[in-house]
Design a protein with these regions (language model features):
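Domain-level signature for proteins that mediate thiol-based redox and metal-cofactor handling
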Residues: 1-121
Length: 121
């Protein structure tokens, strides 16, 4: 379990695919009203695959780390594979038990991904 915690901290301190969403035509955002976490994500699809994905925002370690992990899970996937990524997949990917109160933090990125999915078809 320590390896998972170390990976979460690494993604929090060094988020992957984090930055401005300039140039992304497909964007969505969401906010966790219970804690104030706020994230936005942009996706580029080319030839049926997620060619690029970025996120930006502010939040706790869990929301930022899980968004970073989610971008890694999405990038390079074809859309058929990518639509299978849901809350359960994200919680499994984190690899540690997440309390009910923190699950919304952990799945905020997935909520944004679900908003983006219809825009990609």
């Amino acid at each position: 379990m320590d390896l998972y915690r170390e990976e979460i901290l690494d993604h929090y301190k060094n988020p992957r695919h984090f930055g401005p969403l300039d140039g992304f035509s497909q964007k969505a955002a969401d906010r966790n009203s219970s804690c104030g976490d706020s994230l936005a994500m942009g996706i580029k699809v080319k030839n049926g695959k997620i060619a690029d994905v970025k996120f930006t925002g502010v939040g706790c370690a869990i929301s930022l780390a899980s968004a970073s992990m989610l971008t890694e899970m999405l990038k390079g996937k074809n859309l058929v594979q990518a639509v299978k990524i849901d809350d359960a997949a994200m919680l499994k990917r984190l690899g540690i038990p997440i309390s009910l109160t923190r699950q919304k933090c952990a799945t905020l990125g997935v909520a944004i991904w679900q908003k983006l999915r219809p825009l990609l078809k």
